[in-house]
């Protein structure tokens, strides 16, 4: 805060994606975060370095949707507190600099009322996926653009969507295809859908609510799923993730499905939230403007 978040020194000065040494250098902090989350009842599956300098990823064992959202909030606050105690500043903002952004990929599968597998079907030799699973994904594709405000709730969120940056720009689904917004991974009981659109700044409750609502609409309407995309989705002519909060606001505010699904009050509330954010950003004088214009004019 006192430095205005400028000239901060990252804990790693290079790309430490899957680097054992890179993780070891910050292990005292990572260990305390793992132990703290375990003490809070979470099961930490892995921690690893990532591409941006000082960027690290943590993964937790799956649970029911509401419990995972609760754990998400506890983790983010707890990790910040633990980092502060060790003299570090930690951020989950979607795009803290021009390198790779911070994501919050949501992995989701679902069961029947008696706990039975309903997303999988071993008779499907292509993907091992049931017709209900296909309809659920089709619902995601149908409604992803109008739900973007729930996945990307800040001005900064949209700066993460850059081609080739591990953040999606194309609304397609693919089998283990990281260039798509939706990625199908696993098999059998572990078959699941990854939504790669949410960033680290996401409100998990809103994002998960949107994912479930879109999927159920796909099942209700028996939507047909397009074939899996197999190429580089960044280079495709696919429908795109909104490039700005203004675009996402327009899609959200004008959606009859959003109004029907969440209610007019919820639709109006989050539309107002976006307008407030956009207005505040419009009044700010940024470093980019100073650098570009101070000597120029």
Regions found by a protein language model. Name each.
Residues 1-297:
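Glycine-rich, acidic/polar active-site loops that bind/position phosphate-bearing ligands
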């Amino acid at each position: 805060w006192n430095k205005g978040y400028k000239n901060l020194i990252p804990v790693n000065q290079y790309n430490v994606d899957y680097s054992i040494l890179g993780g070891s250098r910050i292990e005292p902090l990572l260990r305390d975060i793992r132990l703290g989350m375990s003490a809070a009842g979470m099961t930490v599956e892995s921690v690893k370095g990532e591409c941006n300098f000082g960027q690290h990823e943590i993964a937790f064992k799956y649970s029911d949707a509401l419990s995972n959202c609760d754990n998400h909030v506890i983790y983010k606050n707890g990790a910040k507190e633990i980092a502060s105690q060790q003299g570090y500043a930690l951020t989950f903002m979607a795009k803290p600099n021009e390198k790779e952004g911070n994501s919050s990929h949501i992995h989701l599968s679902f069961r029947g009322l008696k706990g039975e597998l309903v997303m999988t079907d071993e008779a499907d030799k292509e993907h091992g996926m049931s017709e209900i699973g296909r309809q659920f994904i089709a619902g995601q594709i149908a409604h992803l653009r109008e739900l973007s405000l729930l996945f990307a709730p800040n001005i900064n969120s949209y700066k993460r969507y850059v081609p080739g940056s591990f953040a999606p720009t194309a609304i397609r689904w693919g089998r283990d295809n990281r260039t798509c917004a939706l990625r199908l991974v696993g098999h059998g009981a572990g078959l699941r859908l990854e939504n790669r659109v949410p960033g680290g700044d996401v409100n998990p409750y809103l994002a998960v609510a949107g994912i479930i609502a879109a999927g159920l609409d796909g099942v209700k309407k028996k939507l047909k799923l397009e074939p899996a995309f197999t190429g580089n989705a960044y280079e495709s002519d696919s429908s795109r993730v909104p490039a700005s909060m203004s675009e996402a606001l327009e899609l959200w505010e004008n959606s009859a499905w959003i109004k029907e699904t969440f209610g007019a009050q919820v639709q109006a509330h989050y539309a107002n939230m976006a307008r407030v954010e956009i207005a505040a950003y419009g009044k700010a004088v940024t470093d980019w403007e100073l650098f570009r214009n101070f000597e120029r004019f």
